Amino acid sequence: DSVTLDHDSLQILQGLTDMPRSPAVDWDSDTSIETTFYPAVEAAIKKAISRSHTVHIFRHGIRHSKNWPVPYNPPAMIAHLDQTGPAAVNRVLRHMGPVDGPRLLQGRYRIVHFWTPLNGPVYTCPVAIASSATVKDEDIRIFISHLGGVGGLGMPLGRPVAKPDPAEQYREDFGAPRYAEGQRWFYLSGISQDEAMLI
């Protein structure tokens, strides 16, 4: 069966052969990622979501279970929603500013994760996703409310910091779905570097 962002909150992109990879991108350098990888991600999102007018990438994170090339940041092992509805509104206001933020909230907006392997196919710890059309609101529980740093949990861009800047802190609510009959779950087996998921 096909899945779509509008129906399932999931879309699979294939044939991304022009995405920059190592050594063109230094995955240990935020500057390299932002200047080399971000434009390609923005272009891929605009192509996949044809009526998107603005794409703003507010952060990135690199998940892996080794200490190289970036600090230990293993995949999450529980099902979760990175943004609840109120947290999504706060994100838009925080990152888009006092003029554009409220204006964007008057129309349609989305927070979309662009997930792709960085070093070959993924065979361990694949990302599992439930179709949002099959998860009821009553099956979602708020499980963390906290003041996060730039990247949440006091960790800008997935890297630990000794002391987060209080000016950069804000409340962020996450959700956790409980399994229920009728939910449809997916994972992409062996997702490769020319594929990505919009979540």
Predicted regions and their residues:
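Hydrophobic alpha-helical segments and helix pairs
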Residues: A43-V99
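Active-site environment of non-heme Fe oxygenases that use a 2-His-1-carboxylate facial triad
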Residues: I78, Q83-S192
